């Protein structure tokens, strides 16, 4: 029996399953294709959180974690757990890169600038990592300025006051908050440089809104109608900007939303916007490595481990062709993260990125660029590729807005694209796995507060086999089982590094 061609992995980003219909965009939306597949095709569920994806118990998954595990075909220990462990066991203060940072800042008589997410969301950063770093640096007698990035997306939309209060209560005498900035400005990943400039101008030059203290900055933003994600860059007290000899330490452990702001703050030759005169930093440190380009001007406390024989690498090594497609918001996930943290395409790997719409928030255009993704996906299905990986961003990105009606519209647009993909795969004689990397839009109201729910969930996600082998059934599993499943459909052996198990029971 010949292998189906192409084999398609269709990732419905943020499409989780929840029995209750209330505030459940997936259940309330009109999804004839998804409903038909669930009724007629082999299906099961996958776990996308906690130890099953290399995270601490109870920690929700996210797109970086999800796509890394999917591409690796094994559970990959993620940075959050590794950093938590280093802090818990006491090795963090002795981290060699951190010791080097301390030595350089001390030698120059500088101040340490720490930028980090002030929440316990654990997707891009964690308040406890920030507090621990402050303690270490202050313990060395180094003055510390914190650039507090408020969240409101991976935690409740108006929880920043609580987190900022938690932070300032434990600050040693030599540490202070210099700026308070919503992640909308400081953590863009779509080249919206006007936003990034406002964030970096506040950190570098102390320009923006002003408040007497950090808690007042949050309160003033709320009074202006800004929830935590959107807090306008605010300078706190008499903070006057960064100076020559200072050091900069980024506490974010996820790359995609740290790259732009770090480039603006420290990349030599940066010209995407006018940064003004930047300081001559004595040291520039990241919690992790963010890209090859960033490695040229900064060091990493916890470099990423090398993941060998990912799905893409293994398929390429067998001389087969593959195609990756997503819109801008999720393009790094189906390329960089799926390939184990490598930017360059594999041999025989083609890519297409649809430009995400330039709107302030995606509830304003819930279809996003899904029609363009669908057009190019259908074209690719008929183009002779062996493996295609596609990500539909809408359920996650619109889910993050907390707008139920918009999330339903997003789900319906993706279902239309899914219908086109199923038809094209069937015509081509291919097979498809439909799944998600984590949940989100199936829970649009916070059950505890009754307000909008904007974060990911720990709900199971679907996995559906379309046009699989006759009599095949699926069993429940985790994201690391997807690559072995795809390889089985492609009739390729599984590399020994992949410890996941195929979900197909023939």
Swiss-Prot record:
Pathway: Carbohydrate degradation; glycolysis; pyruvate from D-glyceraldehyde 3-phosphate: step 3/5. It comes from the Bacteria. Pfam families: iPGM_N, Metalloenzyme. Mn(2+) 1 binds at residues 396, 400, 456. Its cofactor is Mn(2+). Transmembrane segments: none annotated. Gene3D superfamilies: Alkaline Phosphatase, subunit A, BPG-independent phosphoglycerate mutase, domain B. Mn(2+) 2 binds at residues 13, 63, 437-438. Binds 2 manganese ions per subunit. It is an enzyme of class 5 (isomerase). GO terms for cellular component: cytosol. InterPro entries: Alkaline_phosphatase_core_sf, BPG-indep_PGM_N, Metalloenzyme, PGAM_B_sf, Pgm_bpd_ind. One of its GO terms (biological process) is glucose catabolic process. The active site is at residue 63. Belongs to the BPG-independent phosphoglycerate mutase family. HAMAP family: GpmI. Monomer. PANTHER family: 2,3-BISPHOSPHOGLYCERATE-INDEPENDENT PHOSPHOGLYCERATE MUTASE (PTHR31637:SF0). Catalyzes the interconversion of 2-phosphoglycerate and 3-phosphoglycerate. NCBIfam families: pgm_bpd_ind. This is 2,3-bisphosphoglycerate-independent phosphoglycerate mutase. The gene is gpmI.
């Amino acid at each position: 029996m010949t292998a189906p061609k192409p084999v398609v992995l269709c990732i419905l980003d943020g499409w989780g399953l929840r029995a209750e219909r209330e505030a459940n965009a997936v259940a309330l939306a009109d999804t004839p294709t998804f409903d038909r597949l669930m009724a007629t095709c082999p299906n099961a569920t996958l776990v996308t959180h906690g130890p099953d994806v290399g995270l601490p118990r109870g920690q929700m998954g996210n797109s970086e974690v999800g796509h890394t595990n999917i591409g690796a075909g094994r559970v990959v220990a993620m940075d959050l757990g590794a950093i938590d462990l280093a802090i818990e066991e006491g090795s963090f203060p002795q981290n060699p890169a951190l010791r080097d940072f301390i030595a350089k800042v001390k030698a120059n008589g500088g101040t340490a600038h720490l930028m980090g997410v002030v929440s316990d969301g654990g997707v891009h950063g964690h308040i406890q990592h920030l507090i621990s770093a402050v303690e270490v640096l202050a313990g060395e007698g180094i003055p510390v300025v914190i650039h507090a990035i408020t969240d409101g997306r991976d935690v409740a939309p108006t929880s920043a006051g609580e987190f900022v209060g938690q932070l300032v209560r434990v600050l040693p005498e030599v540490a202070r908050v210099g700026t308070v900035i919503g992640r909308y400005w400081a953590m863009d990943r779509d080249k919206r440089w006007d936003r990034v400039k406002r964030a970096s101008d506040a950190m570098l030059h102390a320009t923006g809104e002003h408040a007497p203290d950090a808690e007042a900055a949050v309160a003033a933003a709320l009074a202006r109608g800004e929830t935590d994600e959107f807090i306008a860059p605010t300078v706190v007290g008499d903070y006057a900007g960064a100076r020559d000899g200072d050091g900069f330490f980024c506490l974010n452990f996820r790359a995609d939303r740290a790259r732009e702001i770090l480039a603006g703050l420290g990349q030599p030759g940066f010209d995407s916007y006018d940064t003004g005169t930047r300081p001559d930093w004595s040291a520039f440190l990241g919690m992790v490595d963010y890209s090859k380009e960033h490695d040229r001007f900064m060091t990493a406390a916890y470099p990423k481990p090398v993941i060998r024989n990912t799905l893409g690498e293994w398929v390429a090594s067998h001389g087969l062709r593959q195609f990756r497609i997503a819109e801008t918001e999720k393009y790094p996930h189906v390329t960089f993260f799926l390939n184990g943290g490598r930017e360059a395409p594999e041999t025989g790997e083609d890519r297409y990125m649809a430009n995400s719409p330039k709107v302030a928030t995606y509830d304003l255009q819930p279809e996003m660029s899904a029609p363009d993704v669908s057009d190019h996906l259908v074209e690719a299905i008929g183009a002779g590729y062996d493996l295609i990986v596609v990500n539909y961003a809408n359920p996650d990105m619109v889910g993050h807005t907390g707008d139920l009606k918009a999330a339903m519209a997003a789900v319906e647009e993706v279902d239309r694209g899914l219908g086109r993909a199923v038809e094209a795969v069937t015509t081509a004689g291919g097979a498809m796995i439909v799944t998600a990397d984590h949940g989100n839009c199936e829970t649009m109201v916070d059950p505890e507060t009754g307000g909008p729910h904007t974060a990911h969930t720990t709900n199971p996600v679907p996995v559906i086999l379309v046009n699989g082998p006759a009599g095949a059934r699926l069993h429940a599993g985790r994201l690391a089982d997807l690559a072995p499943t795809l390889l089985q459909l492609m009739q390729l052996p599984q590399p020994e590094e992949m410890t996941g198990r195929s979900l197909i029971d023939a």
